[in-house]
Amino acid sequence: FPTRRSSDLDDDKVLMVRQYRYALKEELWELPAGKLEKDEDPFEAAKRELEEECGVTAERFINLGVLYPTVGYDSEKIYIWAAKGLKPTSQHLDDGEFLDVAGLPFDDVLQMVMTDEIRDSKTVTAMLKYAWLRQRGEG
């Protein structure tokens, strides 16, 4: 089971998941994410996935917008939120889902984005948008 220390939930940390992606044949660091259930509200799905994957709830969320990752051939939408004020609950992974959870310092994750250590489009987009908000004092 993934471990999560209370120090991982500090507001200057980014709760990240590391999991093996079969299509790429490698492990990747990513932000928690998941799929919408039938007729599920995207915001409710974000809250559900955060608790399922990371075993936390959040006091507040900041809407970071919508991402269209593959506009040339797919209509997929990714809804992005930043979660603040994390509180531990319990993790509920799907059958066959294996991932590690860690709270990494914000600046370290941003550096991983800028040096291509993180290449997942939703994570890159979310981190850059949130960095911009932080720079403006809104994060």
Named regions from a protein language model:
Residues 23-29:
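A conserved beta-turn-beta hairpin within the catalytic core of GNAT-like acetyltransferases
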Residues 132-139:
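Generic C-terminal helix-cap and adjacent flexible tail
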Residues 11-13, 28, 35, 60:
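Structural motif
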Residues 35-121:
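Unchanged
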